[in-house]
A protein has these predicted regions:
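A short beta-strand micro-motif common to beta-rich folds, especially ectodomain repeats
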Residues: 27-38
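GH16 jelly-roll
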Residues: 52-301
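Short, surface-exposed loop/turn segments at beta-strand-coil junctions that are enriched for proline
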Residues: 21-27
Length: 301
């Protein structure tokens, strides 16, 4: 309840109802509710409880020294939870001359981001004369942590699946940084790679820092792709084996290390483009499906 005064001795009570979005993280949130009545103004501190931590879940392995702060197991509903994710949409080539049109979950009656039996399927499909697909991002962002996803990659020349990160406060590429945890292109099947991009190191000038490995079952079995990101280094892993490492040169120069700000996670399946379509595309591979079992985020205790 809130009370306001209207003249001498006149006090009126009003009930105020505040609606907020669910807290999908494992950390409480602090905020304020400001109540105004005429010239009167009251600020009320509020705390939103954290989501209960599933620390007792035997299926979640927590890296030593870390704690779970966010996860998506894709075990509820038939489409991604829009309290945790949002779609990027459009057909502008995305700076890579990609051929697909990204949509918000569906194209007409076709469901292109579908959850079934605990698996999210991102589907690239030709409908009419256009290939449609999905690009989705977490609403949360994090500075440092251990990030992992269990993925099965699509088949076919022209496919370009990715699991990556971009800065929350993005102004320019590559100055603000990019972290590619996992990428693969269909014409080079089962070769998975990781990379970072920044002003000093990026593919446009041939200086990108990258690592690659051959994973013969990348398109037929699920594998765990992970990133450990600290103030000192960026490391990626496939099934616990290190794939790539990039160290902070400690020069205090964002041209070589812009990775000291919050980044958010991205999942997408591109079709064609400068890399994905470098050897052409094979439309007989469509529809192509990129499968995601889970996405988890851990931060140091």
């Amino acid at each position: 309840d809130s009370s306001t005064s209207r003249g001498l001795g006149d006090v009126y009570k009003r009930q105020v109802e505040v609606t907020v979005k669910a807290n999908t993280t494992y950390q409480s949130r602090e905020g304020k509710v400001v109540v105004k009545a005429g010239a009167a103004r009251t600020s009320i501190p509020v705390t939103q409880a954290a989501r209960p931590e599933p620390s007792a879940d035997p299926d979640i392995t927590v890296p030593e020294g870390y704690r779970l702060v966010w996860n998506e197991e894709f075990n509820k509903g038939t489409q991604p939870d829009l309290d945790q994710w949002y779609y990027e949409t459009g057909e502008n080539g995305w700076g890579n001359n990609e051929l697909q049109h990204y949509v918000a979950g569906n194209q007409g009656n076709e469901q292109l981001a579908a959850i079934k039996d605990g698996i999210l399927s991102i589907i690239a499909k030709k409908i009419g004369e256009t290939v449609y697909s999905i690009r989705m991002n977490t609403k949360e962002s994090w500075k440092y942590g251990y990030f992992e996803a269990r993925l099965k990659l699509p088949k076919g020349k022209g496919t370009w699946p990715a699991f990556w990160m971009m800065p929350k406060n993005y102004t320019a590429w590559p100055d603000d940084g990019e972290i590619d945890i996992m990428e693969e292109v269909g014409y080079n099947a089962n070769y998975v790679s990781s990379a970072i991009h920044c002003k000093a190191y990026h593919h446009s000038i041939g200086t990108q820092k990258t690592g690659e490995t051959f994973l013969p079952t990348a398109q037929t079995e699920f594998h765990v792709y992970a990133l450990e990101w600290t103030e000192d280094f960026i490391r990626t892993f496939v099934d616990g084996k290190q794939l790539f490492r990039f160290d902070n040169d400690k020069a205090n120069n964002r041209n070589t290390w812009p990775f000291n700000a919050p980044f958010y996670l991205k999942l997408n399946l591109a079709w064609g483009g400068d890399w994905g379509g470098a050897q052409g595309v094979d439309e007989s591979a469509l529809p192509a499906t990129y499968e995601i079992d889970y996405v988890r985020v851990f931060q140091k205790k």
